[in-house]
């Protein structure tokens, strides 16, 4: 049994939960962080001195933190080809795109765009203020668009760990009140992800409670 600490509205928790769901693993999740608190509790800091989520513990093993490290742990322990091959060359190809997604998509969307919109009252939102950040993100989404023109998934013909790392933010990207240039390949890719039960369960989570002024 895998124990997960973290609220379901955290994108970093969602990416881990989606991976757990795709791998069909038994789990138990405890809400903490944001309105649930608990991150400064001594027992939590003993597991993760950073006071951040997610944290997991697999059985009686050592607590693990940092979502990308958790994903690699889950893939290495429970994943099979083509999701996470044993052979180094295809596995490295997948890992390359997973790391690219973490650095270039997550960091350029979550804080400069998602949180800017969520934490600004609707009546005061300014699309022009987001244009620089949208431009940066757009350059990387254009790379993804070209990649997805070659194959149905980010690293090739099969769904892999790279899609977990890349695709978990697309629900927010496609549902946030922002202007989005049409990218046909990216939209079709997102629709393929939406067809996956684990994506719908763990990623397509409403985020209204994160908005400024939410109860």
Sequence positions of predicted segments:
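GST-like fold's C-terminal all-alpha helical module
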Residues: 98-195
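Terminal-tail/helix-coil boundary detector
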Residues: 199, 203-215
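Short Asp/Glu-rich motifs
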Residues: 38-40, 192, 212-213
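Conserved beta-strand edge residues that scaffold enzyme active sites
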Residues: 34-35, 162, 207
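GST-like domain detector, emphasizing the conserved glutathione-binding G-site
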Residues: 1-9, 14-131
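Short beta-strand(s) of the beta-wing in winged-helix/HTH DNA-binding folds
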Residues: 54-57, 154, 200
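Active-site-flanking alpha-helical
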Residues: 75, 169-170, 203
């Amino acid at each position: 049994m895998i124990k997960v600490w973290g609220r379901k509205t955290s994108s970093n928790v969602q990416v881990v939960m989606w991976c757990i769901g795709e791998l069909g693993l038994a789990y138990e999740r405890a809400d903490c962080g944001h309105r649930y608190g608990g991150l400064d509790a001594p027992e939590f800091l003993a597991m993760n001195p950073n006071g951040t989520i997610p944290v997991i513990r697999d059985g009686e093993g050592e607590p693990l933190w940092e979502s990308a490290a958790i994903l690699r742990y889950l893939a290495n322990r429970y994943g099979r080809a083509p999701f996470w091959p044993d052979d180094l060359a295809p596995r490295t190809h997948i890992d390359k795109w997973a790391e690219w997604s973490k650095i270039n998509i997550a960091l350029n969307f979550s804080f400069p765009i998602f949180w800017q919109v969520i934490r600004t009252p609707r009546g005061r939102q300014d699309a022009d203020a987001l244009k620089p950040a949208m431009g940066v993100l757009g350059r990387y989404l254009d790379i993804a668009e070209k990649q997805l023109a070659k194959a149905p998934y980010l690293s090739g013909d099969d769904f892999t760990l790279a899609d977990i790392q890349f695709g978990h933010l697309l629900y927010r990207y496609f549902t946030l009140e922002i202007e989005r240039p049409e990218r046909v390949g990216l939209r079709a890719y997102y629709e393929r992800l939406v067809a996956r039960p684990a994506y719908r369960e763990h990623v397509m989570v409403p985020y209204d409670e994160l908005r400024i002024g939410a109860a």
